[in-house]
From Swiss-Prot:
GO molecular function: acyltransferase activity
Pathway where it operates: Siderophore biosynthesis; petrobactin biosynthesis
Keywords: Acyltransferase, Transferase
Organism ancestry: Bacteria, Bacillati, Bacillota, Bacilli, Bacillales
Coiled-coil regions listed: none
EC number(s) on file: 2.3.2.-
Gene deletion effect: The deletion mutant cannot produce petrobactin on iron-depleted medium. In vitro analysis show that mutants grow to a very limited extent as vegetative cells in iron-depleted medium but are not able to outgrow from spores under the same culture conditions.
Function: Involved in the biosynthesis of petrobactin, a catecholate siderophore that functions in both iron acquisition and virulence. Transfers the activated 3,4-dihydroxybenzoate (3,4-DHBA) moiety from 3,4-DHBA-loaded AsbD to different receipient molecules, including N-citryl-spermidine, N8,N'8-citryl-bis(spermidine) and N1-(3,4-dihydroxybenzoyl)-N8,N'8-citryl-bis(spermidine). Also catalyzes the transfer of the activated 3,4-DHBA moiety from 3,4-DHBA-loaded AsbD to spermidine to generate DHB-spermidine (DHB-SP).
Catalytic activity: N(8)-citryl-spermidine + 3,4-dihydroxybenzoyl-[aryl-carrier protein] = N(1)-(3,4-dihydroxybenzoyl)-N(8)-citryl-spermidine + holo-[aryl-carrier protein] + H(+); N(8),N'(8)-citryl-bis(spermidine) + 3,4-dihydroxybenzoyl-[aryl-carrier protein] = N(1)-(3,4-dihydroxybenzoyl)-N(8),N'(8)-citryl-bis(spermidine) + holo-[aryl-carrier protein] + H(+); N(1)-(3,4-dihydroxybenzoyl)-N(8),N'(8)-citryl-bis(spermidine) + 3,4-dihydroxybenzoyl-[aryl-carrier protein] = petrobactin + holo-[aryl-carrier protein] + H(+)
Residue ranges crossing the lipid bilayer per the database entry: none
Signal sequence, start to end: none
Entry superkingdom: Bacteria
Species this chain originates from: Bacillus anthracis
Protein name, per record: Petrobactin synthase
Matching Pfam families: DUF6005
Length: 327
């Protein structure tokens, strides 16, 4: 359960909590099931773009856990300047500092690129080793850690068409209060809206009907990044597990809702496959079944949200009663 990884930057933040304390990091995954994405001018649904920023995560990481996230990457400066800053941070890193950098995973063939994206912007953590020519790479999202050649890592930063980086100095990690956790849940919870599913549906319809300048052939590129976005839905499992710890409901019930989450994730894989097939074969007759599948996925996710909100309210009431008893 604790090994679910769904978002590279959030996973880095949670890994720091996990390695430096016994504090529960799972609330930080709240709302990630509806995480930001972008649709480019060409109609590509993208998990990363210059239009997406992570300010929300930085703000709430400090609110919940008391740790300030410092953005060292300056988008106003050129790549060489930012690489120089990165080098200084790594080479002068105190023991309690975590240096997070965005690499292009497609430039690291030694590492598995399971989503087959190129470029593949991805956040992970870097530190020095006893060997000058090797760095230690900690990649929580892919559950990978080990030594890499320093020059290869630098190349994956330098030649990354995107860029980004943060550092966190860990002094003390605070345990979020139940009130803070509740505030974060409420802040991120979109009860009636599954934006990714609906935007994907609208885009596929437009491309199939070749509306607004779109072409059916554009669907292949349009849905390529869907698997990277789909795994964010696994963050529901973190939330269910977190509330179950207090509510103590059966494992059978927990598994039922995890299976519904899996239905959605696999549904995205199914839709991606069918959309690509429709584009490759020019068979617009497939559109109806694709739309029906997306509507089915939307209905399942709304059921998940209804149940999750019910559990949240029960959890909140129990926590409120606990605090009254303590008082």
């Amino acid at each position: 359960m604790t090994s679910i990884k769904v978002h590279c930057l959030v996973s880095c933040f949670c890994e720091i909590i996990k390695r430096r304390s016994d504090i529960d990091f799972r609330p930080f995954y709240f709302g990630l099931w509806d995480g930001d994405f972008d649709i480019t001018e060409g109609g590509i649904i993208s998990y990363h773009s210059e239009n997406i920023n992570h300010d929300h995560y930085l703000l709430w990481y400090e609110k919940l856990y008391g740790m300030k996230v410092n953005e060292w990457y300056d988008h106003a400066k050129d790549k060489d300047s930012n690489v120089e800053t990165f080098l200084q941070l790594v080479e002068n890193k105190p023991e309690n500092r975590y240096v997070i950098v965005m690499v292009d995973m497609s430039l690291l063939p030694e590492r598995e690129n399971k989503f087959h994206q190129k470029p593949f912007p991805h956040y992970l953590m870097i530190s020095e080793t006893e060997k000058e020519e090797e760095w230690f790479m900690l990649d929580p999202d892919f559950r990978w850690e080990g030594n890499m050649e320093r020059e290869k890592v630098l190349y994956s930063v330098q030649d990354n068409p995107f860029g980004g980086g943060y550092f966190i100095d860990v002094e003390e990690i605070q345990e979020p209060t139940a009130e803070m956790v509740a505030s974060y849940f409420i802040e991120t919870f979109k009860r009636n809206d599954n934006e990714l599913t609906m935007e994907l549906k609208n885009l596929i319809i437009k491309m199939a009907n070749e509306e607004e300048g779109y072409l059916l052939s554009g669907l292949v590129a349009a849905v390529k990044q869907i698997p990277v976005l789909a795994i964010r839905k696994y963050s529901y499992e973190h939330a269910f597990a977190y509330f179950r710890e207090t509510l103590q409901y059966s494992e059978q019930e927990f598994d039922y809702w995890c299976d519904r989450v899996e239905d959605i994730v696999q549904g995205f894989t199914n839709v991606q496959y069918r959309a690509i097939k429709m584009a490759m074969t020019n068979n617009k007759g497939m559109l109806l079944s694709i739309v029906e599948k997306l509507d089915e996925m939307n209905a399942i996710e709304l059921q998940i949200k209804t149940e999750l909100e019910r559990q949240f309210l029960s959890w909140k009431e129990m926590k409120s009663n606990e605090s009254v008893l303590v008082f």
